[in-house]
């Protein structure tokens, strides 16, 4: 179930007569509990409640209370030992009249009438594996409205298949935007009479729905016709009550899709919702997926929370406006100057979606302007901040439509909030006729033509707002000469997930600038164009982006050329989790990076709730000089060579579980000579066991004598022949071997390719000469043990985390980026002896806790004291080699490592990642 299906199920449950015995199970069913789970809870097999309730382990403890005893029941649930033992996330008590619940992790409490509990369904979304931000959890209206509109959209498509074609898709999307406006307008007195639109459709159309589209067409036509022209236009008398809207929202075709009885019912139900509660930023981001067949199942996936949007907007320009407001105090002249400045500010989102960033920027600026007007004694003054100064580019037409509509709604709501409903209504209609959101490809549109510093070369004013061609990219500004701030959350899309078209777009942009782009994220194009915009103007830009653009190889590939445009990073937000409404969404690790033309101004680094002024910010988001770490083919410190492990690409046919190995040896004992222990990241960290078939070229025929081995070789062959990669197909005949073999037959230090960021150290291991390392490990063969101490140090972890990048938040290791670039002072024999002893102590401490695995031993909350002491001693010895003492913190560690890296590579030619090399 997704959030919208859950909301419908919960609403249905609340409308049914209350059944005390069945409620707990119906509640869990609404959140997606399976029949087998419910059956076992009903029978008592898994229900471990100790107070006569229903307890679902790790989820919720529910108690149906006697009438009037809900508060006491909630207390009993909270103090219940079973609640604690089962690690329940929630407790819930109800008597069918009152409803109380508590989130045991946050302490957040719900108290309401039973019939109103569906309004808080977002509170319980974690029960369905949906983790999301507070704003969405509390926005039950937006979820409900989007879910209902989605059902209507699907039903209309079913009855009007021609409206789903590319030829008419835009008309369908435009129709949905018109409906949303009508629902909002009838509940906010814009239509002067509550439920005017819904009531008119219900009263004037037949219950069999045969003429529903005709009635709606007449209403739309009325709203596109001035009062004096309505008689000649043949507007029905009953439609004359609708105002003239203008703005192009109802211009052009007034065709309406045919409604079935089901679609008509959906429409009337949607009209019955309270549209005054709409949040244009939340609703817009949810509704934009309705018109996308591929995304309809993940409504809400585009939402960026207000706190995360403000991580961009506040340091970009809003903080400065608030500081100037504070400085102005009650000085009328200073307040007037600030208001004048704000009226000329342009906010430009070149990947605006449904307008989240633009809407929040507008609302925040209106809040500041309202305070200015209040201090000047002009609280009801009309806003001087025009919507036309909020610009956007959006690839798809429906989100572009919704972005325009969201801004209109935000303007009206702001007028009501700061000036009163009377003034807001007096000036709302007819809508302004200017266009401010362009539908098109941001990588193909000239941003300066859309949002130039002093207007545009081609000044085109449209006849109306929504009738303007969505591809129009040259629109003049109402206020010229102001500041421009670019912002947004452009598409990330890693290099391996880009389409051919997206690759071509990057090629068109970067080839002419000499930037090797094949391993760059898609969002790098937005940073490039923003930097060019800043270079040519006095603009500034800030984008939310995955942290990968400030880590690993992308720093070396992108940032040197980008910073040569005479721009600088002037603020950055340290990595944080960005989550949306998608089910089982763990979130993406993001950063915010702010760019401007070099000007010597202040720079800031934000992390958690702290703000730190720094002297510089490099592309790794560190207070250090601009250093770019490329791939190195060998260790700059002269350490022994580290290779990637051996890659099977075998369809799983050369790898055996312990049980498969036992079965094979039971039937073919002679096959034991062809089996070896196999180690990847999971085997090293979690202590798992696997084996592989390892056959030399001169042993193939002998191995094939074992039937199961021969069968497995044939499966490997078929798997490789079916591959899309020619290099893999060529190796189909070598089906007895791993496809890439680096080295084997020697003892090795191994380092996992990916490991948890929660551990204080990268969990290195050792394998024996008869054991095989997979490509999920990096290996140093026949090593000296002091290298184990270096790789197991805090210093090495901090370096790798910074220059190699991350997979989500996990540490992603690289030999060519992390190990080979790690700088070391010259080690004396005594240094090596001391480090060898440290490595031995770490290994002995691990051995003392056998059979505990690495994952358990290196859990930061459970790490044994002797193992921690061994690592502390290792860090002490290694760090003393650098500076004669322990480093005070990770910042000091990185500063020293970057300084030493710069010295060790100064004047040396770099074998970068642009040169093919053996890993």
Can you say where each PLM-predicted feature lies in the sequence?
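Short, basic/polar, glycine-containing "phosphate-handling" surface segments that engage DNA
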Residues: 1-189, 244-284, 293, 513, ...
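SAM-dependent nucleic-acid methyltransferase catalytic core
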Residues: 3-8, 12-13, 29-45, 52, ...
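Polybasic, glycine- and aromatic-enriched phosphate-binding surface used to engage nucleic acids
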Residues: 50, 66-74, 90, 524, ...
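Signature of N6-adenine DNA methyltransferases within the class I
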Residues: 87, 98-141, 190-198, 202-210, ...
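Preference for the N-terminal adenyl/adenosyl cofactor-binding alpha/beta module
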Residues: 114, 118-364, 393-402, 440-448, ...
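Flexible phosphate/Mg2+-sensing switch loops adjacent to catalytic phosphate-binding sites
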Residues: 193-198, 324-343, 365-389, 410-432
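Flexible, glycine/threonine-enriched loop-and-boundary segments that flank and lead into catalytic domains
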Residues: 269, 295, 329-346, 433, ...
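Non-catalytic DNA-recognition/assembly elements of restriction-modification systems
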Residues: 352, 708-716, 821-919
């Amino acid at each position: 179930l997704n959030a919208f299906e859950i909301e419908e199920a919960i609403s249905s449950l609340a409308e049914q007569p209350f059944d005390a015995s069945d409620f707990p199970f119906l509640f869990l069913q609404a959140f997606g509990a399976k029949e087998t789970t419910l059956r076992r809870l009903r029978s008592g097999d898994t229900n471990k409640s100790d107070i006569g309730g229903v307890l679902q382990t790790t989820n919720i403890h529910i108690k149906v209370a006697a009438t009037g005893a809900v508060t006491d029941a909630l207390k009993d649930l909270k103090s219940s030992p079973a609640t604690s033992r089962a690690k329940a996330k929630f407790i819930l008590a109800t008597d069918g009249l009152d409803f109380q619940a508590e989130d045991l992790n946050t302490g957040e409490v719900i108290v309401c009438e039973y019939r109103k509990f569906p309004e808080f369904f977002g509170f319980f979304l974690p029960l369905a594996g949906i983790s999301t931000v507070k704003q969405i959890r509390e926005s039950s209206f937006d979820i409900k409205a989007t879910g209902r509109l989605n059902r209507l959209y699907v039903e209309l498509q079913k009855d009007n298949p021609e409206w789903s074609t590319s030829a008419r898709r835009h008309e369908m999307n435009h129709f949905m935007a018109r409906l949303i406006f009508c629902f909002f307008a009838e509940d906010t007195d814009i239509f002067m009479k509550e439920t005017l639109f819904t009531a008119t459709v219900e009263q004037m159309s037949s219950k069999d729905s045969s003429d529903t589209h005709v009635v709606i067409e007449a209403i739309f036509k009325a709203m596109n016709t001035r009062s004096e022209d309505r008689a000649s236009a043949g507007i029905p008398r009953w439609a004359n009550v609708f105002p003239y809207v203008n703005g192009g929202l109802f211009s052009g075709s007034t065709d309406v899709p045919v409604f079935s009885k089901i679609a008509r019912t959906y429409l009337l139900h949607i009209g019955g919702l309270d549209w005054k509660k709409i949040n244009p930023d939340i609703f817009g981001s949810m509704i934009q997926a309705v018109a996308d067949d591929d995304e309809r199942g993940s409504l809400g996936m585009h939402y960026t929370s207000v706190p995360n949007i403000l991580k961009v907007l506040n340091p970009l320009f809003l903080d400065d406006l608030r500081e100037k407001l504070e400085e102005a105090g009650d000085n009328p002249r200073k307040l007037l100057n600030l208001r004048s400045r704000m009226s000329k500010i342009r906010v430009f989102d070149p990947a605006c979606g449904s307008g989240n960033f633009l809407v929040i920027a507008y609302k925040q600026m209106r809040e500041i302007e309202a305070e200015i007007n209040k201090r000047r004694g002009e609280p009801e003054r009309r806003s001087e901040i025009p919507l036309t100064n909020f610009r956007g580019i959006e690839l798809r037409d429906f989100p572009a439509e919704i972005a325009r509509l969201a801004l209109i709604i935000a303007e009206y709501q702001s007028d009501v909030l700061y000036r009163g409903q009377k003034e807001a209504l007096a000036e709302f209609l007819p809508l302004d006729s200017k266009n401010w959101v362009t539908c098109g490809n941001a990588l193909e549109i000239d941003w300066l033509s859309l949002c130039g510093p002093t207007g545009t070369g081609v000044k085109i004013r449209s006849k109306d707002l929504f009738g303007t061609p969505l591809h129009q990219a040259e629109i003049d500004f109402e206020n010229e000469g102001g500041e421009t701030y670019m912002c947004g959350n452009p598409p990330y899309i890693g290099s391996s997930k880009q389409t051919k078209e997206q690759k071509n777009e990057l090629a068109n942009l970067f080839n002419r600038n000499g930037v090797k782009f094949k391993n760059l994220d898609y969002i790098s194009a937005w940073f490039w164009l923003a930097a060019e915009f800043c270079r040519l103007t006095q603009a500034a830009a800030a984008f939310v982006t995955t942290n990968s653009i400030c880590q690993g190889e992308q720093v070396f590939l992108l940032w040197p050329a980008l910073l040569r445009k005479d721009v600088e990073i002037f603020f950055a937000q340290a990595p944080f989790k960005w989550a949306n409404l998608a089910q089982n969404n763990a979130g993406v690790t993001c950063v915010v990076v702010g760019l401007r033309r070099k000007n010597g101004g202040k720079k800031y680094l934000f992390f958690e709730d702290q703000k730190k002024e720094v002297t510089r910010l490099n592309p790794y988001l560190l207070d250090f000089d601009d250093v770019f770490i490329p791939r190195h083919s060998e260790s700059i410190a002269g350490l022994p060579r580290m290779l990637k492990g051996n890659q099977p690409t075998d369809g799983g046919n050369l790898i055996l579980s312990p049980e498969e190995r036992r079965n094979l040896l039971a039937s073919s004992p002679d096959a034991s000579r062809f089996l070896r222990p196999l180690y990847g990241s999971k085997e090293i960290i979690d202590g798992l066991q696997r084996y592989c078939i390892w056959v030399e070229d001169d042993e193939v025929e002998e191995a094939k004598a074992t039937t199961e081995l021969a069968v497995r070789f044939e499966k490997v062959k078929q798997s490789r022949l079916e591959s899309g990669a020619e290099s893999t197909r060529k190796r189909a005949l070598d089906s007895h071997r791993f496809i890439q073999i680096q080295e084997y037959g020697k003892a090795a230090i191994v380092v996992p390719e990916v490991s948890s960021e929660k551990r204080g150290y990268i969990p290195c291991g050792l394998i024996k000469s008869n054991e095989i390392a997979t490509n999920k490990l990096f290996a140093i063969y026949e090593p000296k043990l002091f290298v184990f101490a270096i790789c197991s140090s805090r210093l090495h972890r901090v370096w790798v985390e910074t220059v190699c990048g991350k997979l989500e938040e996990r540490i992603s290791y690289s030999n060519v980026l992390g190990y080979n670039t790690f700088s070391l002072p010259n080690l004396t024999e005594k240094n090596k002896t001391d480090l060898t002893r440290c490595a031995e102590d770490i290994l002995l401490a691990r051995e003392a806790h056998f059979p505990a695995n690495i994952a358990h031993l290196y859990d930061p909350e459970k790490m044994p004291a002797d193992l921690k002491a061994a690592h502390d001693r290792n860090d002490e010895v290694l760090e003393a080699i650098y500076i004669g003492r322990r480093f005070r913190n990770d910042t000091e560690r990185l500063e020293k490592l970057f300084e030493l890296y710069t010295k060790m590579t100064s004047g040396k030619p770099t074998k970068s990642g642009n040169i093919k090399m053996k890993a």
